[in-house]
Amino acid sequence: GVEGFRAIVVECLACAEYAVEQLNAIGVAAWRNPYAITVVLPKPSAVVLDKWQLAVEEDIAHIMVMPHVDRARIDRIVADIAANPV
């Protein structure tokens, strides 16, 4: 019901904030708008783009933190970005 949906949204928002924090910690200038699940970051390497199929517009990419995107997945994306600099 509504409470279950609310819990999913709260977790997505928390994971989006976690993604921003983890990306910032490795020197990536990631950000998101308040109450948004979209994390914006500078365009990563082609290796990362190909592996994770990130959407790109010119020199920026974004990650949509949907319910299937948990902290473990974010950690893997961040590790790949750190291991494959532009």
PLM regions and their residue ranges:
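Conserved C-terminal alpha-helix-loop-beta "cap" of PLP-dependent enzymes
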Residues: 3-86
